[in-house]
Amino acid sequence: MDKLGKFCETIEAAFPFLIKFNPMERLNSLESTEQPSFQIFYGIDAQVKQNLRRVLAAFQQWKVGTHHFSSVSGYGHDDLGRDTLDRVFATVMQAEAAAVRVQFVSGTHAIACALFGALRPGDELLAVAGAPYDTLEEVIGLRGQGQGSLMDFGISYRQLPLTSVGQPDWDAIATAIRPSTRVTLIQRSCGYSWRPSLTIDDIATIIRLVKQQNPDTICFVDNCYGEFVEEREPPAVGADLIAGSLIKNPGGTIATTGGYVAGRADLVEAATCRLTAPGIGSSGGSSLEQNRLMFQGLFLAPQMVGEAMKGNYLIAKTFSDLGYPVSPSVTGPRDVIQAVELGSPEKLIAFCKAIQRFSPVEAYLEPVPAAMPGYESQLVMAGGTFIDGSTSELSADGPLRQPYIVYCQGGTHWTHVALAIEAAVEAIQQL
């Protein structure tokens, strides 16, 4: 049996409901359903290979050895493993410098340190791709009071809305920079919004338009969910600073906590001065025996991202065939987030319950809507993951607000996603 035939049998075994809901016979639907999947998966694997080549070259360049897996205690001064990981990570991210730290408790924390490090009273922060992710609203000062937000420190905020089709407003960006605009915030991922995630080419265009107006304006990219989904990272196209989380893409599903900043050396150091203290910056902070997991997670990351992208393609294809709006589209560029507009709270909750039942950890629990720190709306979340809160492993969640969109993230292997989505479709069909 040829490779395509074997792949088709795998798809049919993992997705029997596709046959149930599709009146066409398997052989008749081969060209329209299974062969495109094979071609798309092959393309993802080719991209994984290129990204892994870049990671491997960085490990070789900086001569990573087993002695880098140990760490020091206390202040964390002269942590050879940590400092070498910083150099490897900077090379992988195509940046001048990087700081990878377990002391970053989340991507939001890393982003906050980056923004507070770069901005001063009287400066303006300009979001150029619509509203930011919910958890950044309190960092900026759009919600909450007296917590030490950017606005509390005299930093102003402005945002440019997206176009009606969810794209950056290029004309508005081309004239948006003011003398006080110190930092532009470019959120790469869709977050909890119905828009395509930004491609590297999109980010390059934004940076070009900003720098044409003021070369000194800092272009900061929230890189969460975007690492390794293309063959270039934002610093390669001119981003001054990026930040993200290790329990997302770059941790390879095994980093237990942490985040990173990468970009210009002075901006990275400024961000670490917000993480630790002025005068300490990147020289402090023990890695707490986590170096080996962070090195290994980075090495695994391209493959894990590829598996998540395959799983998200299957989610998009399945629910699009069933008539649900999906973003990104089946054939559109994607990262590790797949949104499906389910249209009712009952379907959103049923979907998340099914994902939880098909999780390896705490499958016996049932997700219920609840408030979560940093979010305005109640959330329902399915996340039976080995690392608490990991979105590199398969998870699904959504705010309990219209139009009741579920956001699926991650997946250590696409076959697990296939099993979980089969259960989710069955749960929705039974309502």
Model-assigned labels for residue ranges:
Residues 7, 25-38, 55-61, 65-68, ...:
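Conserved PLP-enzyme active-site core in the AAT-like
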Residues 8-11, 15-84, 399-408:
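N-terminal entrance/gating region of PLP-dependent enzymes' catalytic architecture
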Residues 68, 72-73, 99-103, 336-341:
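Short glycine-rich or small-residue beta-strand-to-loop segments that form or flank ligand, phosphate
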Residues 80-98, 110:
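Long amphipathic N-terminal alpha/beta scaffold segment
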Residues 96-100, 123-126, 182-183, 216-219, ...:
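Structural motif
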Residues 320-431:
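Conserved C-terminal alpha-helix-loop-beta "cap" of PLP-dependent enzymes
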